[in-house]
Amino acid sequence: MKKNCFVRLSRTEFHSFYGVMLLCCAIAFAGCSGKSVNGNSQRGDDVSCLCPPTVYLQPYGNFTKNEASRLGKELEKHLLEMFNVDLDCEVLPPLPLSDSLMNKAKSRYRADKIIRSLSAKADDHNIYIGLTHKDVSCSIRGKADWGVQGLSLIPGKACVVSTFRVKNRHDFWKVTCHEFIHTYFNYHHCPKNDPSCLMQDAKGHPNYKNKKGLCGYCKSVLKL
């Protein structure tokens, strides 16, 4: 005769087991729920969210897959150090920069248009970062076409960064982290304007030389 494979629990044991299961489900749900931080919508309860996004690196033009792969490794390393987030960066095949993305008057590519094209591919479980060596621009501070190192939209799911205005290529990961933090955490610039903070507003004159990570204030806001 085939035996039934179950264990009979007392009422007290059943209630204890049921309570533990409910608690586990609640923790798992809270780990990936949205939360507001200092007025900014944050994708996860904290940066150790159970479901970190996949970061897709999209090279454009002559930005090679090897360059993107090296940058991806740097991002994974530094974001793990700063946020204890184990992200997976995946490099996509390079795409051409379409003429429709260019401001032909100044031979610059519109960063906002690049972001919109990337955002169309993104969802709540991934982030796209566009990579280019070409000059990119946006409308900011009363300027119709201002050259920038990078741009993100808050809230958003994509950003773009360019090496064109980065004086030291070893600082490019910092520029990329800056835009990633805007995008992933929907976090604005450092309120303290700390010159050592990666989230300091460059105000048209970016300098990442002495920036290694976030200042104490930004860490506290993001609850790191």
Language-model-detected regions and their locations in the chain:
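N-terminal secretory signal peptides that target proteins for export/translocation
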Residues: 1-14
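Cysteine-centered motifs
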Residues: 5, 24-25
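Hydrophobic helical h-region of N-terminal Sec-dependent signal peptides
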Residues: 19-23
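C-terminal motif of bacterial Sec signal peptides marking the signal peptidase cleavage site
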Residues: 30-31
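Fold-level signature of zinc-dependent metallopeptidase catalytic domains
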Residues: 50-67
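Metzincin-family zinc-dependent endopeptidase catalytic domain
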Residues: 69-175
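Metalloprotease/metallohydrolase-associated module, dominated by Zn2+-dependent proteases
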Residues: 145-171, 187-224
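Catalytic glutamate of the conserved HExxH
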Residues: 175-187
